[in-house]
Amino acid sequence: MEALPSNLIFHELIGLYAEVFESTNPKLINICGRVIDETRNMLIIETEDTHEKMVPKNGTTFVFHLPSSSADHDQRVKIFGTLLLSQPENRVKNIRKIRMR
């Protein structure tokens, strides 16, 4: 399934480029890089200088860059981290339940 703005909260986030847009912790704002791992409460982002930053989902707003078919620019989607609070494998399964309704 392709990652679209409408289904991104149910999609696999590992491998997507992400930015921290807002956070309750000001030190986390503007962290950006590839999502390399995800837990129930955290995204682990590998920055350009290959450091791994653990960013809590709760209290954080992320901007994800979705690759587009045109090489000009990626599509950007802003998502509140609280919408992502669940185990990644369960969140991916939830889209099937919603489609069956």
UniProtKB/Swiss-Prot annotation:
InterPro entries documented for this protein: RNase_P/MRP_Rpp29-subunit, RNase_P/MRP_Rpp29_sf, RNP1, Rof/RNase_P-like, Rpp29/RNP1
Protein family membership: Belongs to the eukaryotic/archaeal RNase P protein component 1 family.
Assigned keywords, A-Z: Cytoplasm, Endonuclease, Hydrolase, Nuclease, tRNA processing
EC number(s) per entry: 3.1.26.5
Quaternary context: Consists of a catalytic RNA component and at least 4-5 protein subunits.
Annotated disulfide bonds: none
NCBIfam families tied to this protein: RNaseP1Mthb
Keyword Mitochondrion: no
Catalysed reaction equations from the record: Endonucleolytic cleavage of RNA, removing 5'-extranucleotides from tRNA precursor
An example molecular function term from Gene Ontology annotations: ribonuclease P RNA binding
A Pfam family this chain is assigned to: RNase_P-MRP_p29
Keyword Plastid included in the entry's annotation: no
Cellular localization per UniProt: Cytoplasm
Main location: cytoplasm
Protein name: Ribonuclease P protein component 1
GO biological process: rRNA processing; tRNA 5'-leader removal
GO cellular component: cytoplasm; ribonuclease MRP complex; ribonuclease P complex
Gene3D superfamilies in alphabetical order: Ribonuclease P/MRP, subunit p29
